[in-house]
């Protein structure tokens, strides 16, 4: 392979060195992605990698120029996120220098090209981004010969989502066509920048529409069980580890062929059949009729966002009703109705958690711990080793994987669940009149005693200056100024949430040096644990890095 190395900037004027970055409040989607990546056992999990095939009589320089045009048009491709006084902000740079590699594979046969491309995708996926530098993307331009090109594009989830990939591919295709034909590119108009969208989003959260959404979700989620009852292989630890693993399978050919017809029969979309089968499986193994399932949604209902590159994904909670032993037809109807109702009342997930004042249990994610994701196109991406939920079923085209919390489940359990799911899905498609109680699943998982924690101990007041300092900030953030803080109480059980934890750490950070990391604070979210860290080194700086 002829590898030409990093690309150089094209012939445009150099960026104005005097121009500084522009700052804006982070969007809700950026907050979620940033927090998740900081807590992850494996940060590269939060890197998306797409490969875009292109066919045009162009040069490598034309494609490098096209990537710079994309970066100039879309603010997230020039953005890095920073915390300022405990709040997350976008820092948009005028023209940062991305890493763009060039490789000539034109002399290779198809098999050798495929292997080189696979290796490159894997390398870009596993290379973490510097969280302090823009841009949060990189690319490789591959010459495949005879007018065939491929651009491998890797980006952090804080600046890029699935829909962004379609937009990047469309714009690259048009820019190549324009270069080939010697004309100006006809690119879609961008009605607003991402920073302006962030401001609009915050403003809408304060309007009457937000009140209607709040009222809907208060009613819909009232009395929701705080944690699922799917049996665990081990008691839940008091702090989340975010350590995950996965098992994969391919959809049987017969299932794939039957999906479209079955969805048409039910008057719904294929995704609803996948989702209904997932809730049926969880019902079988938990015995619960009332289940919460987290659903990632595109978050691009605003027409002004359709052509933008950035991250817009929100999490929505499906409350699945499996009472009364419904058959498959009724279950699909209930699932479709519940999902459609939620689509009318979108609200940022962080706001929903705060709004509902969700009871927090040690080591338990709020509102839902079981999740489902569906992408119509093939491509599950590289294996993951982090997990935000207890269980996530991820369906992409003709493949699926079950991502599981490795602190809670064994691989053998994940294998069993995935095999059960495929059997259950096939019956749901072939015999929708089958009731839940008659579905051909394996034996239900055995219940393992759940950790109940030690018996409540007497409250312990702050015992030294370090604990007093932490407790003072703790009280202010949680609105408990008049009460005594128990130094062993869990921050999240006491009503705190992730963004408040970020502000807590910011206020306690030393004037110089690094402060505690979110991931380590999550491992011991108490006054005592944080105070120990703050006094762990002679100069007062924390040893947590």
Across the structure, where does each feature detected by a protein language model lie?
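A short N-terminal helical cap/helix-turn-helix that marks the beginning
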Residues: 80-81, 172, 176-192, 220-230, ...
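Adenylate-forming
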Residues: 31-40, 49-57, 67-69, 83, ...
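Short, compositionally simple motifs enriched in small residues
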Residues: 63, 495-496, 508, 530
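Acidic/polar alpha-helix N-cap and adjacent early helical turns
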Residues: 19-20, 433, 437-489, 545
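Phosphopantetheine carrier-protein modules
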Residues: 57, 471-494, 501, 511-519
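Short amphipathic alpha-helices and their capping loops
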Residues: 1-41, 65-109, 120, 133-135, ...
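AMP-binding/adenylate-forming catalytic domain of the ANL superfamily
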Residues: 3-4, 427-447, 484, 500, ...
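Short, hydrophobic-rich beta-strand element in sensory/regulatory alpha-beta domains
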Residues: 76-81, 290-293, 518-519
């Amino acid at each position: 392979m002829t590898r030409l190395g990093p690309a150089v900037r094209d012939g445009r004027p150099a960026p104005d060195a005097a121009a500084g970055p522009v700052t804006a409040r982070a969007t809700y989607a950026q907050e979620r992605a940033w927090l998740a990546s900081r807590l992850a056992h494996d940060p590269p999990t939060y890197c998306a990698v797409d490969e875009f095939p292109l066919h045009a009589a162009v040069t490598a320089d034309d494609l490098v120029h096209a990537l710079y045009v994309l970066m100039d048009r879309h603010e997230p491709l020039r953005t890095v996120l920073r915390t300022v006084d405990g709040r997350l902000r976008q820092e948009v740079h005028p023209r940062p220098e991305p890493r763009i590699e060039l490789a000539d594979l034109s002399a290779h046969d198809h098999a050798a090209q495929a292997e080189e491309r696979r290796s490159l995708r894997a390398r870009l996926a596993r290379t973490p981004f510097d969280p302090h530098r823009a841009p949060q993307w990189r690319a490789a331009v591959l010459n495949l010969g005879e007018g065939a090109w491929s651009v491998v594009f890797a980006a952090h989830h804080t600046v890029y989502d699935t829909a962004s990939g379609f937009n990047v591919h469309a714009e690259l295709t048009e820019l190549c066509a324009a270069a080939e034909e010697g004309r100006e590119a006809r690119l879609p108009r961008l009605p607003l920048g991402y920073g302006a969208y962030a401001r609009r989003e915050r403003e809408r959260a304060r309007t009457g529409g937000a009140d209607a959404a709040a009222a809907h979700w208060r009613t819909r989620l009232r009395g929701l069980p705080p944690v699922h009852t799917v049996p665990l292989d081990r008691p839940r630890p008091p702090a989340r580890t975010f350590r995950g693993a996965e098992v994969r399978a391919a959809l049987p050919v017969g299932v794939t062929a039957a999906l479209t017809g079955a969805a048409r029969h039910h008057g719904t979309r294929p995704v609803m059949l996948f989702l209904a089968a997932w809730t049926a499986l969880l019902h079988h193994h938990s015995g619960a009729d009332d289940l919460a399932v987290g659903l990632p949604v595109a978050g691009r209902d605003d027409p002004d966002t359709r052509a933008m590159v950035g991250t817009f994904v929100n999490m929505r909670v499906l409350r699945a009703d499996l009472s009364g032993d419904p058959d498959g037809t009724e279950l699909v109807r209930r699932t479709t109705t519940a999902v459609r109702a939620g689509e009318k009342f979108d609200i940022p997930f962080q706001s929903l958690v705060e709004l509902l004042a969700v009871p927090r249990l040690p080591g338990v994610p709020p509102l839902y711990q079981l999740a489902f994701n569906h992408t119509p196109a093939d491509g599950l991406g590289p294996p993951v080793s982090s997990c935000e939920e207890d269980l996530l079923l991820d369906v992409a085209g003709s493949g699926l994987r079950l991502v599981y919390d490795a602190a809670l489940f064994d691989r053998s359990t994940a294998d069993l669940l995935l095999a059960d799911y495929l059997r259950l899905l096939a019956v749901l498609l072939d015999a929708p009149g089958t009731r839940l109680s008659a579905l051909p699943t394996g034996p239900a998982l055995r219940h393992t005693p759940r950790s109940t924690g030690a018996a409540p101990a007497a409250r312990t007041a702050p015992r030294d200056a370090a604990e007093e300092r932490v407790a003072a900030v703790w009280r202010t953030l949680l609105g408990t100024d008049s009460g005594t803080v128990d130094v062993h109480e869990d921050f999240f059980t006491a009503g705190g949430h992730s963004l408040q934890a970020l502000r807590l750490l910011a206020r306690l950070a030393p004037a110089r040096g690094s402060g505690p990391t979110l991931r380590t604070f999550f491992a011991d979210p108490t006054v005592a644990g944080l105070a120990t860290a703050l006094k762990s080194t002679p100069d007062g700086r924390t040893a947590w890095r």
